Swiss-Prot record:
The keyword 4Fe-4S does not apply. Transmembrane segments: none annotated. It is found in: Cytoplasm. This is Urease accessory protein UreD. Belongs to the UreD family. It comes from Flavobacterium johnsoniae (strain ATCC 17061 / DSM 2064 / JCM 8514 / BCRC 14874 / CCUG 350202 / NBRC 14942 / NCIMB 11054 / UW101) (Cytophaga johnsonae).
Length: 277
C-alpha cells in the first residue's frame, strides 16, 4: 500500500505558513507552534498506525518555498514490524532560496525479521539550510531483541543546485555480518547521524564547535564530527540509549535553529536598508 504525504511550506508577509498539505492514511499533520509571535512554521508528523508494516510504501514530498522556515517533528518512536517482503520509505525535500528545513526524528526500532529501506533526497539551492537527524536502535532491547532484524538501509543524497554534494548509505544486516565488530557498532546498541548543510555560509566551523561542546557533556557515547565540504557537517554517534541520543540531537538542532533565525533577521534588515538606499 502506498501512503502519501505532501507538504508545501510557504512564506507571506514575513511569516512561514502551511500553504498546502495532502495526506492519506496513516499520515496526519498538526501545527504545534507554541509562540504565536514566532514567524516560523512548526509541524508534527503523526500516524494512526502503530508502526511500519510489511509491504508498506511511504511516499513523502516536502517543498520549502523561498524564505520559509519549517521545523518538522515526529510523534513517537518509529517501529518496524516483522516482515516477509519488506517496507520502503521515500522522502523528497526541495528547498528554495533562503529557506530552512529542520527534522530530527524519534529513534527507529526495527523488530525481529523486519526489512526496511529508506531513500531520502534533498535538493538545495543557494542560501538555504538543512538539518536532518536519524537514530537507529538495536530493536526491542528490553524484550531480548538485540539486532534480530533482517535488514535496515537508509540512503541519503543531498544536491546543491543539481550537484551531488553528500551521499550517505547506512546498511545494517546483522544476520549476515557481525555489527559489533571494529568499525561497526563496537559494543554499542544505537547509531545516530546528524547532518547539517548551509549553502548560505562559507564555513561551518562554529557549528562543529557547537556540536562538540554539546556531545562532550554526554556520558557513555562515542562520537565524531566530519566536514565533507566547507558548508557541511556530519555528526556520528554511538550509544546505548535512544532517548539520550534524541535529546542530544534536539539540543543541537535548537541551537542551530536559533542561530540561523538571528542570521535571517540580520539579512532581512540588511535587505531593507539596501532597498531604502
Amino acid at each position: 500500500m502506498i501512503n502519501k504525504l505532501n507538504i508545501v511550506s510557504g512564506f507571506k508577509e514575513g511569516r512561514s505558513y502551511l500553504k498546502d498539505a495532502f495526506f492519506t492514511r496513516p499520515f496526519r499533520i498538526a501545527d504545534i507552534k507554541e509562540d504565536k509571535t514566532d514567524p516560523s512554521l512548526y509541524l508534527m508528523l503523526m500516524s494512526s498506525s502503530p508502526g511500519i508494516l510489511d509491504n508498506d510504501h511511504y511516499d513523502i514530498n516536502i517543498q520549502i518555498e523561498s524564505e520559509s522556515r519549517l521545523m518538522l517533528e515526529s510523534q513517537s518512536y518509529q517501529r518496524l514490524f516483522n516482515m516477509q517482503n519488506g517496507a520502503v520509505q521515500q522522502m523528497n525535500v526541495s528547498l528554495a532560496d533562503k529557506s530552512t528545513f529542520s527534522y530530527v526524528q524519534h529513534p527507529i526500532v526495527p523488530h525481529e525479521q523486519s526489512i526496511f529501506k529508506a531513500y531520502n533526497v534533498f535538493n538545495l539551492t543557494d542560501n538555504c539550510s538543512l538539518t536532518v537527524g536519524e537514530i537507529i536502535t538495536c530493536g526491542r532491547k528490553h524484550s531480548g531483541e538485540v539486532f534480530l532484524f533482517s535488514k535496515f538501509q537508509n540512503l541519503t543524497e543531498v544536491f546543491h543546485n543539481g550537484k551531488l554534494v553528500v551521499k550517505d548509505n547506512v546498511l545494517l544486516q546483522p544476520l549476515l555480518a557481525d555489527v559489533q565488530t571494529l568499525g561497526q557498532m563496537e559494543g554499542f546498541t544505537h547509531q545516530a547521524t546528524l547532518m547539517y548543510i548551509n549553502t548560505g555560509i562559507e564555513d561551518v566551523e562554529s557549528c562543529i564547535e557547537l556540536a562538540y561542546a554539546e556531545l562532550q557533556s554526554e556520558e557513555n557515547i562515542a562520537f565524531g564530527v566530519s566536514k565533507p565540504f566547507a558548508n557541511g557537517m556530519i555528526v556520528r554517534v554511538l550509544g546505548n540509549g535512544g532517548e539520550q541520543l534524541y535529546n542530544a540531537f534536539r539540543k543541537i538542532q535548537r541551537k542551530l535553529w536559533i542561530a540561523e533565525e538571528k542570521l535571517n533577521i540580520k539579512s532581512q534588515v540588511t535587505d531593507l536598508a539596501e532597498n531604502y538606499i
